[in-house]
């Protein structure tokens, strides 16, 4: 592969190359066992593997319920395998542009065709014209379509059939297991939201393809620079079309309302770049140049500036500005991996939604004992029947916020004529009951299924970027 950095204008920046730095040695120490950081995952034979969860038609299940379960997971080979996979993906794209001269392999192209099919469903299912800042109901229709079609599409993909080949017999249940990860990569259809846990599901989907030997190690760079980048662009389209809420947003004290991995992978792309430094994200000329088409990190900054036009980067993304003060991209990438371990893989609210079955297994460690404090702190997993549940302090889609004036103008007449109506996304309206507006205590109410909510966490929880 060739790079075109010398053909791109430098904007007057000085060379930033440090050829003595060994990034592999640095990030290997972030693995569970640095000697195994480059080891391949445990492979399985999709034709002979014994599926788990047969009683649930092979669909992968959630196994991390408590802090004890999460600590047990962190001691397992599955956790090490997942973390190493992410580190390997990052290492394999170091210094490489999205515009590099790729040779697209047959299986990578098959995944592109599959994603294009799911992308077409967005075109086929336009958003409904409704009055809400908290997600468009058409996302549920799109999600249901994806759930229905994904097992068949994956079966044809993995068995080298044309994607839309009719399937006369029932799809083997192992494909339902793999489908679970891809289906849950797009967000939550009940809450109509999206966050880093859904992004992690897409990585698990790619890991499944590696473990069944559909993808080879030499294709890892294509998984990120082509497949993950395609996924990222699809997610932006979904977020913009259906106004997905950010799940578990840290507000201004987070990297991004929705994503984490584009910053991790994107920082690796920029390691030892001749001109672009971390502080370059504060230069509008660079951010709005062709560099943002080549590097995910800069592309994220440009996208944030586009959709959050109400203030400067410092005002709406101070953490990104803080990170821009780091000396070089290798330290940024190292910090991103540390932060991903602590803020994603180390957080129960995210990891309790991770799926396990026969390909990606939950391996319990009986030596990990749940403490009395952890037992007392146990809370039920929060579930919702629909996004209009008003039981928690939710963050509206930034796309909805950007279009507030347009919505208010188009709905003002209707609002004046229907003063007694309840706006979707502001209150619960099942059985004409409204949720308490204070939400300062546990409560129950009926949304076709009873569910409990503990007190909500602070709306903005600051994350810290690890530099040491």
Curated annotation (Swiss-Prot):
Gene Ontology MF, one: peptidyl-prolyl cis-trans isomerase activity
S-S bridge residues: none
Gene Ontology BP annotations: mitotic spindle organization
Keyword vocabulary terms for this entry: Cytoplasm, Isomerase, Rotamase
Principal cellular location given in the protein's record: cytoplasm
EC number assigned by the record: 5.2.1.8
Compartments (UniProt record): Cytoplasm
Catalytic activity: [protein]-peptidylproline (omega=180) = [protein]-peptidylproline (omega=0)
Membrane-spanning segments: none
Gene Ontology CC terms: cytoplasm; nucleus; protein phosphatase type 2A complex
Pfam families given in the database record: PTPA
InterPro entries reported in the protein's UniProt record: Phstyr_phstse_ac, PTPA_C_lid, PTPA_sf
Gene3D superfamilies: 1.20.120.1150
Enzyme class at the top of the EC tree: isomerase
Region (Disordered): 412-468
Domain of life: Eukaryota
Compositional bias (Low complexity): 412-424
Function in brief: PPIases accelerate the folding of proteins. It catalyzes the cis-trans isomerization of proline imidic peptide bonds in oligopeptides. Acts as a regulatory subunit for PP2A-like phosphatases modulating their activity or substrate specificity, probably by inducing a conformational change in the catalytic subunit, a direct target of the PPIase.
PANTHER family per the UniProt record, alphabetical: SERINE/THREONINE-PROTEIN PHOSPHATASE 2A REGULATORY SUBUNIT B, SERINE_THREONINE-PROTEIN PHOSPHATASE 2A ACTIVATOR 2-RELATED
Family indicated by similarity: Belongs to the PTPA-type PPIase family.
Protein name: Probable serine/threonine-protein phosphatase 2A activator 2
Species of origin: Dictyostelium discoideum
